[in-house]
């Protein structure tokens, strides 16, 4: 679906936006910054359409927004370190978590960044291996390997490490 017209954008926002925001929240752990990052990615997409045109805009926007959210987190981290050095208290820190089961969220958070991102794209956004590979600029084999490792790590963590082979 091309997000090139107002109608396309309205349709995207109505159908994909909530899932993309949820995916970015899961990938980055940034509950409050995810909607802003998704909106920035959409604006960037409209201002400078990527070439070649992505096969799946939801996946493309999720990756772009995840990157924007991570950049914002880095900036906040640098700001927090500077504030600590100045002994200025940070206000408004919200430690709210997703409505996911605590164990599942903890297991997902424990995954390496790329595995977590690939899992969310694949399982939450129902993206194919090829679409994820294209969006992340990696091979399909890399995506498959990361999915396999992520599934193993999640299963081990969620079952208390009581898995065979």
Residue ranges: model-predicted function:
Residues 20, 24, 34-45, 64, ...:
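Short, small-hydrophobic-rich alpha-helical interface motif
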Residues 103-112:
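Short amphipathic alpha-helical boundary/capping segments
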Residues 12-31, 48, 62, 108, ...:
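Amphipathic, Lys/Arg- and hydrophobic-enriched alpha-helical face
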Residues 66, 136-160:
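DNA-recognition helix of helix-turn-helix
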Residues 2, 40-57, 75-76:
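Sigma70-family region 2
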Residues 1-22, 32-35, 116:
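A short, charge-rich alpha-helical start-of-domain segment used by transcription regulators
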Residues 63-85, 97:
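Arg/Lys-rich amphipathic alpha helix in sigma70-family domain 2
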Residues 118-122:
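A short pre-motif secondary-structure segment
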């Amino acid at each position: 679906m091309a997000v090139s017209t107002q109608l396309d954008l309205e349709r995207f926002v109505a159908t994909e936006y909530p899932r993309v925001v949820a995916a970015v929240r899961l990938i980055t752990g940034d509950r409050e910054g995810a909607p802003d990052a998704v909106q920035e990615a959409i604006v960037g997409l409209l201002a400078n359409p990527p070439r070649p045109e992505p096969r799946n805009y939801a996946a493309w926007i999720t990756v772009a927004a995840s990157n924007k959210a991570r950049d914002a987190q880095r900036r906040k981290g640098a700001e927090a370190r500077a504030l600590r050095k100045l002994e200025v208290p940070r206000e408004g820190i919200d430690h709210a978590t997703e409505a996911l089961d605590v164990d599942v969220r903890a297991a997902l958070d424990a995954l390496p960044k790329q595995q977590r991102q690939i899992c969310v794209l694949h399982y939450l956004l129902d993206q194919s291996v090829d679409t994820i590979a294209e969006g992340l600029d990696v091979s399909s084999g890399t995506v498959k390997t990361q999915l396999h490792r992520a599934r193993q790590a999640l299963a081990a963590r969620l079952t208390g490490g009581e898995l065979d082979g």
